[in-house]
Amino acid sequence: EEFVDSPFSAETTKMLYSRGYLTDKNIDEELNYVQHLAHLFHQRDKKLFKSFAFLVAYNCNFRCPYCFETNISQDGRHWSKRVFSKELVDKAYEAMLLIEPQKELHNKIITLYGGEPLLKENREIIDYILKRGKSLGYKFDAITNGYDLQAYMDVLTPGLIEALQITVDGCKERHDERRTHYVMGKSFDKIIENIGMALQRGIKVMVRVNTDANNFADLHYLGQLFEQLGYSSLPNFKMYSALLRGDNNDVTSQKLKYIGAKKFHDLHKKEKFRYNCQDYGTLNKIEATIRTKKIFELHSIYCGAQSGSAIFDPYGDFYSCYQTVGDKKHIIGHYGKGILKYSDASKHWYEHNISVSHKCSHCKYGLLCGGGCLAKADYNIESGFGKSFCNDYPSVFAIAVNKAYDVLVTNKQFL
């Protein structure tokens, strides 16, 4: 009765109404409904899987100009040298059950992180972390620069460290200029060799290319190199391009030329998306929606940092976001004394969703995007997050829809 003047047939009008394209709600009612859904989705996510990581040490053997952990050096070299003790490893595993008592809700893959987790001098404590974790039913992956991998080849195996993310920043010359070993200097050749050895061990290797305007063309070079080496034909190898964000006025980043998200995706579009690029999982969700004919997966948060995940550091503190580790105002809590003590920051992180952001709650992409990365949003330790960080999701979504059409419709994979 509300849509008697509809230009569509009764059947089409009913379908549009059932899907929410037509509504009998006014603007305020729609916004209230979105906020209600945002809270429901957030509560759902907080009750689901928790992910955990060990920040083995803040120390790193590389000196990269764009590293977000550069500010950690302000605490002095000695501060970053501390490595996990066996006692703290035990307490971290105990803390995981305090954070989420239902072990079946634990992500069974624990991430090893840093700094650089797989420094050769960290081998003893890595062995202890792996041994304790395996006895408790966990497996591992690692985010590593890949330089010291030869010291870990025997534990790069199914059941222990099963996957690696390794950064390669373009051709040899450019990579060596950006990702410099603090003693040996050049690192490209050794990393490429180590990637090959890791692949031979049967584990997954994801090569990440931190991409700006200066090295975008190097994606083609790397693609050819990995084909020539036989890496690309292996099912356990992937390479993807990740947008490098930063300020071009930063004097520490003179070797870099940052670009925005729209420019980044426009460049990939010109290359007909020959290389995988960062799209926050949007393409996979669209393809899954079409294939399964189920509703698109909606979220009111950007990632697990807002739903209770924890990154344990060697000082007895834990964080929720990889990009805020070492920044004391983002400490979520403390676990080092055998009990969990949450900080005020935990409320800011774990209670933030799109409903508390005027911009995000009014955006039609809000429940698809989840509100953008909080690590890049305005933040105050007392009041929490202010203006949200928009990652140009509308253009990301439009590109993903077109890619899904090309893959599923043109190739008739949806049938």
Annotate each language-model stretch with its function.
Residues E173, E177-Q306, K328:
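Radical SAM enzyme [4Fe-4S]-AdoMet core and its adjacent flexible, acidic
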Residues W79-V83, E177-G185, N380:
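Short glycine-enriched, charge-decorated loop/helix-capping segments at active-site entrances
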Residues V56-R63, Q306, C360-H362, G366-L368:
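Cysteine-centered iron-sulfur cluster-binding motifs in ferredoxin-type domains/subunits
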Residues E29-V155, G159-E162:
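Conserved alpha-helical substructure of the radical SAM core
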Residues K257-K293, Y322-G370:
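C-terminal accessory region of radical SAM enzymes
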